[in-house]
Each structure stands twice: as C-alpha cells, then as structure tokens.
Design a protein with these regions (language model features):
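Mg2+-dependent phosphoryl-transfer active-site scaffold
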Residues: 3-225, 233-241
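Pyridoxal 5′-phosphate
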Residues: 230
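A short, hydrophobic C-terminal helix/tail in secreted or cell-surface proteins
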Residues: 242-246
Length: 246
C-alpha cells in the first residue's frame, strides 16, 4: 500500500482479484452523466413549471412510462439507446419494473440466446417447460429461462446440495470464465463430492444427461450475466430517465 502524492487516497499494488481474496471490500463506482441529466431536468421543471419532482418517489410501475419504453423511442435513455435494445423493448413490451430488470439482464451476449424463449413464455405461458421439476420454483418468475446469476446459485443449491458459499464460488468461476474450475465443478454438480459434502444431482434423482444439460445452460448464461441487484439498479435509473419528460 502507498499513499497517492496528489491526495489522501491509498493505492494497492495488488490487482482486484487478490484484494478480494485478502478480504478487502472492492466496490466499483460509475460516474454517469445520466444522473446529472435527470437532476438538471427535475430542477428545470421546478423552475419553469413550479412542479417539484422527488426522484425517490417515482412510481416504478407507471403505465405511461412503461408504454413509452415499449415504443422503442428511447434515444438518450440509459441502457436503451442501441437499436438492438430498442427493438427488444418493442417485442418485450414491459408491463412492470420486473420486466424492465429482466430485459436489461437478457440483453447481453450469454443470456441473449434466451430472449425468444423468454418473450414466448411471457406471451404464451403454456409453452413454458422445465428440464426437471426442481427448476420450476426457481425459473417460474422468468418464464422458464435463466436470467440472473442468483438463479445459478439457487440451481446448484437445490439440485446438487451446494452450500450458499459454494454456490457463490461456482457463480464467480463462471462469470470470470475460470475454465478449470468450471470443468471441476461440473463433476461435483452431477455426481457430488463427499469431501465437500456435495450430494450431486444424480444422487438427488436427476438424470445424468439432464444434469449435464442444465450445467451447460448455466455456463453459457453466466459468462456475461448480471446479478439481479445490478440489473435492478440500472433499471431504476433508466426508468427515471423518461419520467421528467412525461
């Protein structure tokens, strides 16, 4: 550790991975112009129209705002500016903040392959299916699709008997693309590991081929997936963006 010459900040020579392993808290702070734009818009409305807007009290299930997002006319709105995302929102037609959160999580390289299945499940609930019955309680809120990192953790806990800590380790290995860990954990997920007290899917009555298929889906998904809290923070921010305009 050393102190910066241009201020009071402390700098570590360790990279972010080692800092976390040493037990230090690592936080990422985003400096977003969107926050300034929203604040300036709220001040302008108060100054010109005498209407004071409390951003913290916005109705996150306001139908007018959701309809606006569904039009795809979202230039200048955080996370919704790309043509691909605008097209996706027109297809998704979100009816709640939960839909917006899922939309942000899905529009990424890994989860993106689930978009057609998600939209079909949303519009045609009878089309939803699960690789095994144990997945239903985990994936029902997202129409049978894996959408969040937390769902990966729930799956390995419920199907294979991982502890919460072990589940977080496998989530992290997948998101960091640590292939040697991913390959090792596949065997534990399917067949278990006595030393780590992991029972495994097969011992829990889940077919070996089904278990491997579920693991493949988790690996493909988790490489680029968000955790839900991350997506929720983004969704609240983008949801706020059109509100002052309306």
């Amino acid at each position: 550790m050393y102190k910066r010459q241009d201020g009071d900040g402390l700098v570590s020579q360790y990279n972010m991975t080692l800092v976390e392993e040493l037990g230090l808290l690592k936080m990422d702070f985003l400096g977003l112009r969107t926050l300034t734009v929203i604040n300036d818009a709220a001040k302008h409305i108060e100054r010109t129209k005498g209407i004071k807007i409390n951003i913290d009290e916005i109705d996150y299930n306001d139908p007018k705002t959701l309809d606006h997002i569904s039009t795809g006319n979202t230039n200048g709105i955080f996370q919704l500016e790309s043509a691909g995302m605008q097209s996706f929102m027109k297809q998704l037609r979100p009816k709640s903040l939960e839909d917006v959160i899922a939309g942000i999580s899905l529009y990424r390289p890994g989860p993106m392959e689930f978009i057609p299945k998600y939209i079909k499940g949303k519009n045609e609930p009878e089309s939803i299916s699960y690789a095994c019955s144990e997945l239903e309680s985990i994936l029902e809120p997202t129409y049978g699709c894996i959408v969040y990192q937390e769902q990966v953790m729930q799956i390995v806990q419920k199907l294979a008997g991982y502890t919460m800590g072990q589940a977080d380790n496998i989530r992290r290995a997948m998101s960091k693309k640590k292939q040697y860990v991913i390959d090792e954990e596949r065997e534990y997920f399917v067949y278990g590991n006595k030393e780590r007290n992991i029972k495994g899917c097969v011992a829990n009555g889940i077919d070996e081929a089904v278990a491997n298929g579920i693991y493949d889906s988790m690996v493909d998904f988790a490489k680029y997936a968000f955790n839900k809290s991350h997506a929720a923070a983004y969704a609240c921010l983008l949801y706020t963006s059109p509100s002052p305009r309306d």
